[in-house]
C-alpha cells in the first residue's frame, strides 16, 4: 500500500498555548545532521494498554487504546509517555498495516491537556477516521510529560521526535504480541506544535530503525 495521505507536515508560523495553560520553549537549535541519534533498544517498551472510550471510532476502528510506553526523555533517561493507538477494522494487507503518526497541535503543558484524556476534536476525528478507512494504523502520541510524570518540554524537538519514534516502536511491539502485522513503513503528519514534532520525527527517524517515508 502506498503512502498517499498527508505526506506534508505543516509547521505553523505562530504557536500559542491555549486553554490548559502557558509554557515556554527550552529547545536549542535543531541540528541538521543527526548522525549521533541513538537507536531505540528499549526492552519491553509497552508498560500497559487501556481502552480509549472518549471518542467512538467503532465503525472504522477495530481497537482504540491508550498505550503507556517507555521512551528516551529529554534528560537522556528512560521515562514513560502515553499515546493513542487506533487499528483499522480491516485485516492487515500483505506486509502489514503501514503506520501514520498524528502529531497533535498545541494543547497546553498540564497533564490534563494530554489528548488521550479527552474526546478528539471533530477535525481530528475525521482525519483519523479517513486514515483508518484507508488501512493505516494511527498512532497519536501525547508527547513527553503530557499526562505522565515530569515536565512537558514544550517545543523541544528531540523530545517531540523521540515521543513519536518510540511510540511507533512500542505500538509495533504491542500489535505483534497480538499477532497483528504492521509494516516497517511509517510517516508523521501534524500541525502547529505537531508540525514541529513531525519535522523532528523526520530528522530523527533513524532511531526507530524502520522505513520512514
What is each PLM-predicted segment?
Residues 154-177:
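Alpha/beta-hydrolase active-site loop
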Residues 16-19:
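C-terminal motif of bacterial Sec signal peptides marking the signal peptidase cleavage site
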Residues 21-92:
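Catalytic-loop region of hydrolases
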Amino acid at each position: 500500500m502506498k503512502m498517499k495521505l498527508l505526506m506534508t507536515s505543516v509547521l505553523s508560523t505562530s504557536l500559542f498555548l491555549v486553554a490548559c495553560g502557558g509554557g515556554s520553549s527550552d529547545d536549542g537549535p535543531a541540528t541538521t545532521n543527526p548522525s549521533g541519534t541513538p537507536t531505540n533498544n528499549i526492552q519491553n517498551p509497552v508498560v500497559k494498554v487501556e481502552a480509549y472510550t472518549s471518542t467512538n471510532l467503532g465503525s472504522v476502528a477495530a481497537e482504540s487504546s491508550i498505550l503507556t510506553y517507555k521512551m528516551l526523555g529529554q534528560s537522556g533517561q528512560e521515562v514513560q509517555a502515553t499515546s493513542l493507538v487506533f487499528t483499522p477494522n480491516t485485516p492487515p494487507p500483505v506486509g502489514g498495516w503501514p503506520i501514520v503518526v498524528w502529531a497533535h497541535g498545541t494543547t497546553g503543558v498540564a497533564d490534563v491537556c494530554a489528548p488521550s484524556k479527552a474526546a478528539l476534536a471533530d477535525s481530528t476525528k475525521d482525519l483519523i477516521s479517513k486514515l483508518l478507512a484507508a488501512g493505516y494504523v494511527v498512532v497519536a502520541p501525547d508527547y513527553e510529560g503530557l499526562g505522565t510524570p515530569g515536565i512537558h518540554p514544550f517545543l523541544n524537538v528531540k523530545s517531540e521526535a523521540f515521543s513519536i519514534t518510540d511510540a511507533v516502536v512500542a505500538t509495533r511491539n504491542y500489535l505483534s504480541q497480538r499477532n497483528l502485522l504492521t509494516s516497517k513503513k511509517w510517516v508523521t503528519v501534524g500541525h502547529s506544535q505537531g508540525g514541529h514534532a513531525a519535522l523532528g520525527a523526520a530528522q530523527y527517524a533513524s532511531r526507530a530503525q524502520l522505513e520512514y517515508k
